[in-house]
């Protein structure tokens, strides 16, 4: 086989390119965390991007959908964080169809044609679509469906974070296979069957009916994506080890290393070229055709960037320099393409990879801080765990960036920028540099916390998880006196003894279920017949009655408060007070909810009541308290999928430009509680950049030590 070489590097996306697809030799699709998807068009040898911003949040996957109509160029499908799939006809500038139905992020897609499209989601289901209509909902996985494949007109394959592969005929499950030792990340069709890859670092080949054939080993970390190269009968794979690998049978023919941390997606063009998307925001094309190979100076620059790529010492383990070989080891050939060795060069440690094609070792990076964990480094008379060299401009000496593993990276970044009189707008970039060079994955380790793991492992801190907070304070005599005053104005008043019974019960704080049922009827009668401005005391009474409700009564209280939230707009003054009181009541109901149906209703209430900047302080506090109590319930019930959904609501609330300190503190308590689950913490970090947001809030309220402590505790969870 002629080896693949770089053809083009296409820049334009501002964040990770999570998905790529082949449309034709001249058209490529891409999806990015920057919230856009793009169609790249080759015109006169140059690639021109057409970016589209039709999603809310990041875009996670993209695939080409051939059209049945021969007059159409087909569609590009994109799916992402907003739970929506979009079909856009190639060559047009607006969506043709919106695909609604998934209850969480859409993370995978595959299509035979516009009548047979399959999507996978964090909601643990796959859906099959004909244009904009859902034909089937494939249920059975216990976690995110990260891989889908339309194998035939009604034959579908799904792979999940639950480690299973399932084969479907229509919506009927045909076979379930415990396929891998970790999350299944991608599927691709091969002659006579399909291939799968996983976080376990292994690629497996299967017949179309799910019989195992053989497996491929070579990747040193998670394998994210697969594609079949039809005109050469090869498989290409990519992953967290920065490589694309080319396979023929059981043999790895070539290993291409990229100057980036992760290669997320790979796809093959009809002419055999490969396109990939990576964590540095680039789309790259590799080719075996000498006509399409990049100019020599471009290739040289690419190889130089690969060789200078900084590899965290944690990525390769705690290296002892004295035990490493010197350059003499490079005189011995590698055993297989892609083999990696660590070499001691003076005071440095360099990584080299064996190239079968060129029959030589090629430098693929320099290990940063490749020393034992106990060593400290001096900078301006102080000891630090790390002192990095940071290049800020060509021709200038690198600047020193000191950092201790125990400190907040944002503090280190701010100190570095202020010391060197650099703009604070670079803070996020410096933090990413620190995190990349101090938080690596081991080349020998295949484990990554997946976003939908059912593990109940939690991290404990001195604050989290917090306890649920109830709204239990009330001036019962004043509340009931107000009820009597209003009741006396009614043409059809309540019996006086009903309000007397309510006052006695609330004052005693020991109420039987029978009494609560009777008092419920009194309060519900008020809600049904009194105006919004008059219902406040009744809602307040219901809030108190909801505390310590039995399993029989809790759903009733939940339904009552939910009805108020859904039926009353929160824009007017009286309206917003009604909703605020209902949110307080819901907060008191949460400790007595034990099922997923109740959780779903609580989530609906939160979603529909996210406060505006102009919302009253009490409204914001009630909302944040409900979110905090719900976060604790989700952890108790191990509902991690819903926990990840709650993150979206929390970060929307935390974006308030006119925050209230108590409300924000309770929202931070909710966030910290959720992030005691590593999978949710990973989602908070990767999707919402939680560290930056938490740091900004702590700075805003830096005069309050509780925010400083909360920041420290939350950041320790990532």
Swiss-Prot record:
It is found in: Nucleus; Cytoplasm. CDD domains: WD40 (cd00200). Residues 462-717 form the PUL domain. WD repeats lie at residues 12-50, 54-98, 101-139, 140-178, 180-217, 218-257, 259-296. Keywords: Cytoplasm, Nucleus, Repeat, Ubl conjugation pathway, WD repeat. One of its GO terms (molecular function) is ubiquitin binding. One of its GO terms (biological process) is ubiquitin recycling. Residues 353-448 form the PFU domain. InterPro entries: ARM-like, ARM-type_fold, PFU, PFU_sf, PUL_dom, WD40/YVTN_repeat-like_dom_sf, WD40_repeat_dom_sf, WD40_rpt. SUPFAM superfamilies: ARM repeat, WD40 repeat-like. It holds the Pfam family PUL. GO terms for cellular component: cytoplasm; nucleus. PANTHER family: PHOSPHOLIPASE A-2-ACTIVATING PROTEIN. Acts as a negative regulator of vacuole-dependent ubiquitin degradation. Interacts with cdc48. This is Ubiquitin homeostasis protein lub1. It comes from Schizosaccharomyces pombe (strain 972 / ATCC 24843) (Fission yeast).
